[in-house]
């Protein structure tokens, strides 16, 4: 039973549902305590968690849609749904940051008596729950290469920092009695929220605008190609992009012009399999080109009958 539960929450949809349950529970606690304590920093936390809940709901839908197989209208699959999900989450986080800034400034102008005791207990619970949840989501995002799950992990990870700031602020209010520290802490914590929103937005924009694969992936890709250079003249026009957990790679491969179609196809298969082994979930498209005389100068093939023939003709 336990193994089944662990296996379930290790999938993209299972992790999203786990996050949904944890965040919902934290929202209920924060809303109740924010009402009792009159703390703007806890209210800001509750607002942030509510937006997390909304964005996780979007993630559940996006993950469900992104894993649907390619069809006639979507021949490249539905992976970009995860990018849209991450972008929506980013805008929600940035919007939450703006709301927190406004509320904190209003609280500085219009002072309010707060009761920090209950808030301290809730923040401790929130920090512990968010920390372990964000770690789990990061593991799942890394294993499944899910942009949407990674965005949720980033948002909840930012909650750990912001909740820690709120906790320190409430402790300071409890010790010193300086209630102005509450909105000041809220303004400090919003920096972490805005940073998480910005980073998530950048990743989502890159995916939706067909940004090239990261340098690490491109290095692996070039390494795979060079391993097959013993039978390749050269390669060029390498293009790559990503959609959700799927990678798409295109390249032009120059081969000796006397190679048969069968052998050329076999070499393409070998290279495609090598790329997929090093870069999982990759769709590889290779365009084969024949070599010409001007390719001999940079040809990587050590022994070539064509080059010998051309050399002898030029000598004659």
Outline where the language-model segments fall.
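Peripheral (non-transmembrane) domains and long loops of multi-pass membrane proteins
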Residues: 1-16, 73, 78-81, 196-316
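Alpha-helical transmembrane cores and adjacent cytosolic helix/loop segments
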Residues: 1-220, 311, 315
């Amino acid at each position: 039973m336990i193994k089944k539960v662990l296996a379930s929450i290790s999938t993209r949809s299972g992790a999203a549902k786990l996050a949904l349950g944890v965040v919902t529970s934290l929202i209920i606690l924060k809303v109740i305590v924010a009402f009792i304590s009159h703390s703007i920093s806890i209210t800001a936390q509750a607002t942030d968690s509510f937006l997390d809940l909304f964005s996780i709901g979007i993630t559940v839908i996006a993950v469900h849609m992104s894993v649907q197989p390619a069809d006639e209208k979507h021949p490249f699959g539905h992976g970009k749904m995860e990018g849209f999900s991450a972008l929506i989450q980013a805008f929600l986080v940035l919007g939450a940051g703006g709301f927190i800034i406004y509320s904190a400034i209003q609280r500085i102008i219009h002072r309010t008596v707060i009761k920090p005791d209950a808030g301290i207990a809730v923040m401790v619970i929130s920090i512990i729950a968010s920390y372990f949840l964000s770690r789990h989501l990061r593991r799942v995002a890394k294993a499944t290469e899910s942009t949407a799950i990674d965005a949720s992990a980033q948002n909840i990870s930012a909650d750990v920092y912001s909740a820690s700031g709120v906790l320190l602020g409430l402790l300071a209010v409890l010790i010193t009695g300086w209630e102005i520290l509450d909105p000041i802490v809220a303004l400090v914590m919003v920096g972490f929220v805005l940073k998480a929103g910005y980073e998530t937005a950048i990743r989502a924009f890159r995916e939706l605008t067909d940004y090239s694969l990261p340098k690490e992936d491109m290095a692996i890709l070039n390494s795979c190609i060079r391993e097959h250079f013993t039978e390749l003249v050269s390669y060029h026009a390498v293009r790559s992009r990503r959609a959700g957990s799927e990678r798409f790679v295109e390249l032009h491969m120059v081969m000796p012009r006397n190679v048969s179609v069968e052998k050329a196809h076999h070499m393409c298969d070998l290279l495609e399999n090598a790329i997929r082994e090093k870069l999982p979930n990759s769709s590889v498209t290779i365009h084969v080109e024949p070599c010409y005389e001007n390719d001999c100068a940079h040809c990587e093939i050590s022994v070539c009958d064509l080059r010998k023939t051309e050399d002898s003709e030029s000598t004659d």
